[in-house]
């Protein structure tokens, strides 16, 4: 199957062969994709996209390319596009996967570093939106509070809070949710005893103060996930010392920030071919290492720990600080570009403490072991709060629907919810790989409905042997805390999630839409046609 996927994709080529690169002019882009221009007062559209981040911009591009007659708008609750890459502003913010796969398939990443910093990624998103005219189809500070579906009208009605707090009503035939999976307003903050006693500053990375001065300060970062391992080395350039306080270790893997093979390909080959080769190299390598780790978890565990030990040098208690209790990919691996965290620890500018917090004190933290950990600044890199669809209330024909009570169809639609798709990327690879496939499949659905005169489509399980599974794809804290809010997966296709790009590509890009599960419907004669 994987070889078949490779042959098909290379035979077909990619849009990159005909699309401009990141540094190409807008004139070349306009020759390939015609930007949709909504009227200023228009509130009724064929498609409404909620969220102007990585996913939403990608969906807009695909609509313009594959469904050029469809009207659409992007409603963004914040004041700027970019989603995650505009929200998080902490030191060192960066990607934790390579930009050749986190970047769009239709627009090559041309930065020298494959592991890119947040501002560069945000520039890439802004440039993409501007280049394809998508920025003209975004309405900022528009928060969708409620979406109500009417089968008799084949229409979604959206209650939206506008820039001035005034309620505005929008409507569409198809609703595409690209609002992420976590609460943008607040991160997860455990309630530790004595927090009010601490005389220093307590900061959550999701609400990073613009002018936080940590020069010469003792900093403690609570957490061991991607945010923590990013913050610690980034802050050592100014801080007196940075300590990462973790309750338990995570798997940490060093990787070069620059991809020498990809950079060589871009130097030697035409850009489209180089983009395809670099992208598929990383896709296949990631799939190989993930599958190998799942088949031989103990071997993968020892390999990862051994590489970390070689980076850290002697004198580090590997069993205590760098040996997790779980297997690789039960939780997402943490990436450190060029081994920056290991270098900071080896140089004595940073340290890892594995313990639990008993209480905050006036001058730092008291740990369960009895140790006192002094701090001037404490950063709580304690994770996210799961919040699907931005907390929007979902109603179908007068019935409130909780996503957690539904099953996920092909990882993008909800059972028995018509004309709604939601982008949710991979947990074991770059988010955009699945986001791109979701956008492509959305366009295939829309075009099929137009060809057949259908008004809406609904994923409906007709197979009694399909059983729901509420187990989240990762055992990470935020996934466990939010598992009841997430749609369940089923025991077999098309309800089962494989977290596998090749399988999803075959299903979403090349597979049939008429799978017996996605039910297409026309408006009844009595309902009449919409004017």
Language-model features: locations:
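Short hydrophobic core segments
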Residues: 49-50, 144, 169-182, 219-222, ...
């Amino acid at each position: 199957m994987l070889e078949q996927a490779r042959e098909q994709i290379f035979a077909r080529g990619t849009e990159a062969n005909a699309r401009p690169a990141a540094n190409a002019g807008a004139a070349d882009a306009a020759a390939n994709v015609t930007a949709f221009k909504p009227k200023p007062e228009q509130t009724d559209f064929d498609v409404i996209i909620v969220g102007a981040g990585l996913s939403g911009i990608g969906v807009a591009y695909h609509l313009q390319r594959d469904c050029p007659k469809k009207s659409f708008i992007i409603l963004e609750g914040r004041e700027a596009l970019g989603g995650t890459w505009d929200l998080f502003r902490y030191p060192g913010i960066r990607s934790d996967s390579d930009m050749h796969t986190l970047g769009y398939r239709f627009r090559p990443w041309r930065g020298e570093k494959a592991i890119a910093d947040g501002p560069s990624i945000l520039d890439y998103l802004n440039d993409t939106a501007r280049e394809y005219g998508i920025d003209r189809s975004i309405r900022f500070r528009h928060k969708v509070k409620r979406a109500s579906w009417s089968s008799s009208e084949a229409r979604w009605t959206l209650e939206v809070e506008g820039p001035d707090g005034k309620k505005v009503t929008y409507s569409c035939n198809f609703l595409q949710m690209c609002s992420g999976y976590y609460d943008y307003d607040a991160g997860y903050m455990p309630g530790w005893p004595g927090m009010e006693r601490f005389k220093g500053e307590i900061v959550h990375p999701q609400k990073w103060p613009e002018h936080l001065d940590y020069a010469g300060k003792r900093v403690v970062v609570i957490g061991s996930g991607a945010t923590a391992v990013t913050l610690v080395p980034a802050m050592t350039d100014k801080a007196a010392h940075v300590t990462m306080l973790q309750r338990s270790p995570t798997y940490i893997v060093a990787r070069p920030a620059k991809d020498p093979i990809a950079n060589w390909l871009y130097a030697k080959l035409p850009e489209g071919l180089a983009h395809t080769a670099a992208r598929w190299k990383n896709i296949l390598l990631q799939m190989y290492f993930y599958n190998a780790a799942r088949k031989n978890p103990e071997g993968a565990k020892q390999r990862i720990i051994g590489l970390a030990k070689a980076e850290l040098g002697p004198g580090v208690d590997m069993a205590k600080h760098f040996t997790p209790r779980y297997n690789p990919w039960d939780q997402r691996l943490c990436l450190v570009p060029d081994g920056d965290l290991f270098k900071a620890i080896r140089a004595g500018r940073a340290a890892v403490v594995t313990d639990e917090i008993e209480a905050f004190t006036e001058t730092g933290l008291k740990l369960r072991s009895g140790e006192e950990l002094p701090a001037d600044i404490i950063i709580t890199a304690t994770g996210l709060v799961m919040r699907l669809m931005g907390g929007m209330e979902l109603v179908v024909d007068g019935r409130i629907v909780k996503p957690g009570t539904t099953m996920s169809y092909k990882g993008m639609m909800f059972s028995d919810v018509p004309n709604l798709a939601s982008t949710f990327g991979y947990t074991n690879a770059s988010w955009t790989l699945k986001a791109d496939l979701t956008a492509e499949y959305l366009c295939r659905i829309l075009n099929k409905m137009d060809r057949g005169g259908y008004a809406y489509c609904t994923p409906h399980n007709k197979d009694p042997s399909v059983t729901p599974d509420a187990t989240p794809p990762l055992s990470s804290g935020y996934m466990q805390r939010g598992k009841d809010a997430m749609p369940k997966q089923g025991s077999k296709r098309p309800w089962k999630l494989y977290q596998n790009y090749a399988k999803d590509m075959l299903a979403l890009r090349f597979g049939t839409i008429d799978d017996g599960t996605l039910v297409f419907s026309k408006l009844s004669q009595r309902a009449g046609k919409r004017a």
